[in-house]
Amino acid sequence: KAKGKAKRRSSRAGLQFPVGRVHRFLRKGNYANRVGAGAPVYLAAVLEYLAAEILELAGNAARDNKKTRIIPRHLQLAIRNDEELNKL
């Protein structure tokens, strides 16, 4: 019986962030004795959403400053000017 091609968990979950790497970090980080199969997928999705949100705001900050490249200052401005991100 021919095996199907291996499919990465990230693409299976429709994510860009690496689910396997997040799973490894959860195991190695001594957070718990066991890590469920859904936990790294959920965490990777949350991290990807946060990264996208921050990059969107930083891109806007860069455009407001008439720049085509995001610099650390734009990231800082984006986070400081957003009420919820500023709380984190």
From Swiss-Prot:
The lineage of its organism: Eukaryota, Metazoa, Echinodermata, Eleutherozoa, Echinozoa. SUPFAM superfamilies: Histone-fold. It comes from the Eukaryota. It comes from Strongylocentrotus purpuratus (Purple sea urchin). GO terms for molecular function: DNA binding; protein heterodimerization activity; structural constituent of chromatin. PROSITE patterns: HISTONE_H2A. GO terms for biological process: heterochromatin formation. Core component of nucleosome. Nucleosomes wrap and compact DNA into chromatin, limiting DNA accessibility to the cellular machineries which require DNA as a template. Histones thereby play a central role in transcription regulation, DNA repair, DNA replication and chromosomal stability. DNA accessibility is regulated via a complex set of post-translational modifications of histones, also called histone code, and nucleosome remodeling. One of its GO terms (cellular component) is nucleosome. This is Histone H2A-beta, sperm. Monoubiquitination in C-terminus gives a specific tag for epigenetic transcriptional repression. It holds the Pfam family Histone. The keyword Nucleus applies. The nucleosome is a histone octamer containing two molecules each of H2A, H2B, H3 and H4 assembled in one H3-H4 heterotetramer and two H2A-H2B heterodimers. The octamer wraps approximately 147 bp of DNA. Its main location: nucleus. Keywords: Chromosome, DNA-binding, Nucleosome core, Nucleus, Ubl conjugation.
